[in-house]
A protein has these predicted regions:
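Positively charged n-region of N-terminal signal peptides that target proteins for export
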Residues: 1-5
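Bacterial N-terminal signal peptides
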Residues: 8-16
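Intrinsic disorder/low-complexity segments
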Residues: 17-24, 52, 115, 129, ...
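Short helix/turn-capping signatures at newly exposed starts of structured segments
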Residues: 22-113
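Short beta-strand element of the conserved SAM-dependent methyltransferase core
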Residues: 68-75, 81, 115-117, 166-167, ...
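Long, charged/polar, surface-exposed segments that mediate recognition or autoinhibition
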Residues: 83-162
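Non-cytosolic coordination micro-motifs
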Residues: 130-212
């Protein structure tokens, strides 16, 4: 075999292996897309529209996005939908979706959205963390896992010191990724979700919550 023939075969083998490796890469997960707490999550819901439509009502929205519908965002007893069957997001079983909007008076608006997952907080956090945006910033605090940002002076800033019991200052917005126990109404389950709280503007909703 000539050197030239061997080199051609070698290049072909490398290209084939690269193609196989690319084909084997897992598709992006919904949890991973959600964790950015931005518009990309709703793009991901659109991309998985057909699969999600089999277990929940999924509405398409202008701009190539989609969202999972709940009966009423502003009503506590209507802001959650349980899937007709679990959705396996890689190795994380999603059993429902929540979408909450609350008016908190002088403190502004509170928006919260995400998934309810079967499992325990520490276990789900361990499974999900490798897929999370800015995973190194996710911290454990009092039984929950959190990553927090603050909108101030016209842009988002990392703020790993945000305290959950302190209201946002006027003119600011907190954006939080939270992994927490889902509460007594969902025994043995965990909430993985995002929230916006404070002086949320229409312009901000357009980039973070285009479904509203």
């Amino acid at each position: 075999m000539s050197k030239k023939t061997f080199e051609v075969m070698l290049v072909g083998s490398v290209m084939a292996l690269a193609a196989q490796a690319h084909a084997a890469e897992p598709a992006g997960t919904l949890i991973g897309a959600l964790s950015s707490c931005q518009k990309g999550f709703f793009d991901a819901v659109e991309a998985k529209h057909d699969a999600l439509s089999k277990i929940a009502t999924v509405q398409r929205h202008a701009g190539g996005t989609a969202f999972i519908e709940v009966t009423g965002r502003a009503k506590e007893d209507a802001s959650f939908v349980r899937f007709s069957a679990p959705y396996q997001d890689a190795d994380v079983p999603l059993i429902g979706y929540f979408d909450e909007v609350r008016d908190i008076g002088t403190l502004g608006k509170y928006y919260s959205w995400g998934f309810v997952v079967q499992g325990k907080v520490d276990d789900i956090a361990k499974q999900a963390t490798p897929r999370l945006a800015e995973a190194k910033r996710v911290r454990a605090a009092e039984g929950v896992y959190v990553r927090s940002d603050l909108w101030r002076n016209g842009h988002w800033q990392d703020d790993d010191q945000l305290a959950g019991n302190t209201a946002p200052a006027p003119g600011t917005v907190e954006r939080v990724l939270l992994i927490e126990d889902a509460g007594p109404e969902f025994s043995g389950a965990v909430r993985i979700g995002c929230s916006l709280q404070g002086s949320v503007t229409p312009a901000m909703l357009a980039t973070e919550r285009p479904d509203i």
